[in-house]
Amino acid sequence: MPKMKPIMIAAALTLATIGSVPADAGSPKPNAQAAYAAARIWGYEANIEATLGLCREMDSANAVAYDRLYHAFVTATAPTMARVYAILTEESIRSGMPPDTATKRLDPSMPRLVAKQTADANPTLFIEEQCRLGIGHEAEIGRLLAAVLPDDIKLIESWH
């Protein structure tokens, strides 16, 4: 799958204020590390979804295979992504901001843009290395987040 640096940087920058605003004394303290981990996971997950969508468009002969991969990925990551959104919402509140502050700053068009730029640079290579290598690996794609971002997954799993 594509490198995530631009997405991770953008996600981190959008959450820079989490933890910088003091919360009420009686409420839990903000956990910026958890918010950053959640944002990185969101960015990686969004990039996989965008890549699979672009694969479906560019390699339409294998559209059904990409649909299976997408379904397997979204199904497997749904609990993690629910936790990601819960963390981003709660950490915004703990930082004294409206609940949707962090989630509103995660730009869903960015992953598509990154995938599109990668594909435009070399369409044949994109299809061969980013798309077709995933075909038939529905079981593995569900474990991708934990394999690529193990520390972030551990951090959000231990968040409270």
Positions of PLM-derived features:
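Bacterial N-terminal signal peptides
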Residues: A10-I18
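Immediate post-signal-peptide N-terminus of mature secreted/exported proteins
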Residues: D24-R68
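Compact alpha-helical subdomains of small soluble proteins
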Residues: Y70-H160
